[in-house]
Amino acid sequence: MTATNHPKLFKRPVDGVLLLDKPGGMTSNEALQRVKRLFHAKKAGHTGSLDPLATGLLPICLGEATKFSQFLLEADKSYSVKGRLGVRTASGDSESPILTECPIPKLTKRALEKTLFAFRGVIDQTPSMYSALKHKGQPLYKLARQGIEVERKTRQVTIYELTLLDWDNESIELYVHCSKGTYIRTLLDDVGEALGCGAHVVALRRLRVAHYHEDQMIKLAHLEREYDKANYTGLDRYLLPLETMVSHFPAIKLSSSTAFYLQQGQAVMVPNAPTHGFVRLRDQNDQFIGIGEILSDARIAPRRLIQKR
């Protein structure tokens, strides 16, 4: 019997980050639940949904790692995306009804580059009705499936890099490095409109989240092959330490007394600390204990502290 169909599964406290290569045809929550069962984890969460059509990097946070998920939710992300030209759909991908079909103009690399140039930098996006954003507590995609459309506010996002990888008479492939909150389906839909023919996503792969990258990903099928119900900890070797989630923040080593007071919820003074922002907190044994924030009076306040097992 596998972990995915076991009726009464033993659950344990386990901490770490799994860089899952989400397969296509599966929701992010379905992938999360599969991983949670494989690791027999009491607590798990992911850091930003991928569409069912999409594949690629889906960081899964187990146990205490969930306390730091916001830092990955807010991080830059990178994708490769393939779009079909000449067809615009309701959701911006191939899994919804066609809205319009238009002839595709003769495209040159120069014309494509000129179009893409306009989408680099800070741009405004109007989220698709087929998104997880909520209107009066109801996800937009549920309203869209009922044929209901509501007004959505535009949002500013940043496209740091938008590179033409390939194109032919029917399709276009792009590399996108973008800020949090960017809808790739919306981006491709807007690019298609700018080209005068419309476009929609037929393949999407997330390559990077913050400093985590494609080469670090683990496939779900590999985890399922490696799973051993007699050894609950066997898959733990694939987990990354919690501290890797916040490695971009400077580290502060604390004395035993300072660490004690911080863990009691008190702000403390630390010599030679940075003047602002978040910091990684390490105790007198150089063990990661959480995240603190520099206050205006130069003290460090605890923000996310991990529970010692």
From Swiss-Prot:
Its EC number is 5.4.99.25. It holds the Pfam family TruB_C_2. It is an enzyme of class 5 (isomerase). The active site is at 51 (nucleophile). It comes from the Bacteria. The keyword Isomerase applies. GO terms for molecular function: RNA binding; tRNA pseudouridine(55) synthase activity. Keywords: Isomerase, tRNA processing. One of its GO terms (biological process) is tRNA pseudouridine synthesis. The keyword Transferase does not apply. InterPro entries: PsdUridine_synth_cat_dom_sf (IPR020103), PsdUridine_synth_N (IPR002501), PUA-like_sf (IPR015947), PUA_sf (IPR036974), tRNA_psdUridine_synth_TruB (IPR014780), tRNA_sdUridine_synth_fam1_C (IPR015240), TruB_C (IPR032819). Responsible for synthesis of pseudouridine from uracil-55 in the psi GC loop of transfer RNAs. Belongs to the pseudouridine synthase TruB family. Type 1 subfamily. This is tRNA pseudouridine synthase B.
